[in-house]
Amino acid sequence: SSQANFDVHPYGRPGIGSIEDLNAATLDDVKAFHAAYYRPDNAVLVVSGNFDQKQLDAWVDKYFGPLVSPKRPIARVTAVEPAHAAPKSLTVYAPNVPLPAVMISWPAPAASSPDVAAWQILDAILQRGQSSRLYQSLVYEQKLAAQVGSIMEIRQQPGAYSLVAILSNGKSVDEGLKSLQA
């Protein structure tokens, strides 16, 4: 969905770049990227399971305590995705995909927006579980889709909200789009 939703912003690219980007990167490019982003103030340590807290604290101090954050700030993305003047369509074909799928996306707020909670409630009502409105309508009543879902990209900058339907055998993309838009 990101590729279709973002023309300018890096959200529209894979996290590590395309194969072409990776193949074109020099050793100096990789070292510079590592120095810029792989640093203590841009990392998160996650520990789960049954462990001894004192032992964990000792290991964290031993292995991570000596690491020093650089004095320079982390470069942040400042690109702004312009509003789309017209709806966009993207068709993707892939091998071994037994059923067609359709997706419709809308701009979504940034994570800092007070509207995020309302979007999360909307998402739960529309598509969470077999009692959700989309599931009831598209899967049970219309028998149009085998599965429905959503992708909510709530990020640091404005993201996207997408509704997805994997269509039932014999159903057309046009039928799927019409039902998602209803």
Can you name each region flagged by the protein language model?
Residues 27-63:
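Non-catalytic, conformational "gating/processing" segments within enzyme and secreted inhibitor domains
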